[in-house]
Amino acid sequence: MSQEFDYIIVGAGSAGNTLATRLTEDAGVTVLLLEAGGPDYRFDFRTQMPAALAFPLQGRRYNWAYETDPEPHMDGRRMECGRGKGLGGSSLINGMCYIRGNAMDFDGWAELPGLQDWTYLDCLPYFRKAETRDIGPNDYHGGEGPVSVATPKAGNNPLFHAMVEAGVQAGYPRTEDLNGYQQEGFGPMDRSVTKNGRRSSTARGYLDQAKKRPNLTIVTHALSDRVLFDGKRAVGVTYLVGDSEERVEARARKEVIVSSGAIASPQLLQRSGVGPRALLESLDIPVVHDLPGVGENLQDHLELYLQYACTQPVSLYPSLLWWNQPAIGAEWMFKGTGIGASNQFEAGGFIRTRPEFKWPNIQYHFLPVAINYNGSNGVKEHGFQAHMGSMRSPARGRIQAKSKDPRQHPSILFNYMSTEQDWQEFRDGIRLTREIMAQPALDPYRGREISPGADVQTDEQLDKFIREHAETAFHPSCSCKMGTDDMAVVDGEGRVHGMKGLRVVDASIMPLIITGNLNATTIMIAEKISDKIRGRKPLPRSTAKYYVAGDAPVKGKPMREVKQA
């Protein structure tokens, strides 16, 4: 006998936990929240310590560890595509960079038919609703939300300040808040970390206040098999628990909400019979609704590192040495302070590489150590690096289910670097980064260029380095996009076109990828749509001012000119 709820939410990630918390604020509403992973164990430093952010990517307890098909423009590499597994979803394993995107991203969404209420000023109140910033609220930031946001503090690593100053010396603006009036420029970077130095996942921020409500049922280790339909209406789901092959059925009186992320949401729809007819028929899946955009329009951010030796012993290199780690861990565990309490991404920036870009097309994260994002290939000396990536690539990929089996990973292809714009942006980005790194502010610290290496100069040499070393920034999105065109999957409220009682609410419904990290925006989307589901009036539009570059020059004259090939 199946259980029955008002709403079934598939996926307890950044969006799913937000929705579950908001929907169950109405005491008469019952919600079933299904999560394929396990709990977010609060004593597991791998997910709770900000500085340990690389650890969850190295195993499969908290990571789906997807891989792409061979990427044709990246020497056929199968690229890593980590996604969070467990309460919190990818907010449980991400880099904790609290970046919202550029105001022009959302104004661009709102220019699309059917998305008129997605302007930046419509979205800003929901960013504020979700946030508690440690230095207090203002026109751009909240003070009472579930997501704890920490700002960089005086006394942090001197390399952060030097790298921001170098960006300004190279001719770019200085900004005091990458989520405030002006994103463009270099400045301190906020992070999703609590005042006690713990990761602020949506499991901690949202579910901690909701999980004891009698109208919320949370089932972990529950892998959703498919959505059940009565004609074109979603009426429930079947799921597997643990290693069992027995299907458990749950029924939804009102809606099934798919919040499984940009990889798994389109895969679940396809397995359930909602997607491109030819694909479904090739997998012997009965077609419930032919919807060609399901799994298409896939987008991501690609990035690479420029690494330098550090001539002063101020980098985090000693923290990589095992004999120093117990003391770091103890300070974090008992005091919530020290190196362990930060993700160490405390400075960054956004720039335009050419005048045709009307808002930034390159993002920087600065890190005071030289190491891969997943913790591999740490340079065995003092060093620092700039993560540099393009923001709005024209490349488009796709997600395709391979079978009806929910345990089989889908076919994933991003088509990285498939357009000439991609190559131009990365070549420009590397050369501009070298100019930034050559500025006087970094003279006390800058040693040799470790990667790519000073001898890598020509377009051909740079292209080879990009093909071999560029990596995902772990920002898959847009694979069930909002809109009204033939390839749109959902409307501006997340309702699946042609269906009843079925929504998708997560990063997959972004029509176009944003300029920056995705987590804060994914939470905002869920906050905004939760009001739609509950029949509440939207929050009043913000009246905050925001920067538009217009005809402003891309950059000023650098303090130090650098000759490059």
Swiss-Prot record:
Binding site for FAD: 6-35
Names of required cofactors: FAD
InterPro entries: BetA, FAD/NAD-bd_sf, GMC_OxRdtase, GMC_OxRdtase_N, GMC_OxRtase_C
GO-annotated cellular components: membrane
Entry's Gene Ontology BP terms: glycine betaine biosynthetic process from choline
Associated pathway: Amine and polyamine biosynthesis; betaine biosynthesis via choline pathway; betaine aldehyde from choline (cytochrome c reductase route): step 1/1
Lineage top rank: taxon: Bacteria
Keywords for this protein: FAD, Flavoprotein, NAD, Oxidoreductase
Cell inner membrane keyword on record: no
Single GO MF annotation: choline dehydrogenase activity
Substrates-to-products reaction catalysed: choline + A = betaine aldehyde + AH2; betaine aldehyde + NAD(+) + H2O = glycine betaine + NADH + 2 H(+)
Record EC number: 1.1.99.1, 1.2.1.8
Active-site residues, as the UniProt record annotates them: H475
Family, per entry: Belongs to the GMC oxidoreductase family.
Function: Involved in the biosynthesis of the osmoprotectant glycine betaine. Catalyzes the oxidation of choline to betaine aldehyde and betaine aldehyde to glycine betaine at the same rate.
Name by which UniProt lists this protein: Oxygen-dependent choline dehydrogenase
Organism, scientific name: Pseudomonas putida (strain GB-1)
Organismal lineage: Bacteria, Pseudomonadati, Pseudomonadota, Gammaproteobacteria, Pseudomonadales
